[in-house]
Amino acid sequence: MELHRGRLIDHVHLRARDLKASQRFYAAILGVLDIPVVSDDKHLVADELWIDAGEQSSHVHLAFQTSDRETVDKAWRAGLAAGGKDNGGPGERKYHPGYYAAFLFDPDGNNIEVVHHGPAQRSAASVKLTF
């Protein structure tokens, strides 16, 4: 399989109080985004996202980029079905023209965004991922 993704962040490491709930939540959203997830009873790894069990010291905002609005909608619905809590349904935002996003809280209260930038793309050039 080969994917082309924009890059801005090297990696994000989250702690989850309930790793199984986080595994369900992230597998649902990342499955819609066609991102492979590897997990066991201690970890979840999906590209630059690493999650392990432990106590949180703070919450984060994490945004996943998509190539179209339909994928934003689908990922938001998948996240809700997998135990996420609505934090702003799919729609245009005023950050810049064409910014279309949806927000959910993951099982640990992190603010998860799925975004399509539309014509005003500001992401880095894509890299080729082969696995």
Show which residues each predicted segment covers:
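Vicinal oxygen chelate
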Residues: 17-19, 64-108
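C-terminal "cap" of GNAT-fold acetyltransferases
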Residues: 3-9, 40-55, 131
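Core segments of cupin and vicinal oxygen chelate
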Residues: 13-50
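Short beta->alpha transition motifs characteristic of CBS
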Residues: 97, 103, 114-121
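Helix-adjacent hinge/juxtasegments
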Residues: 54-55, 60-66
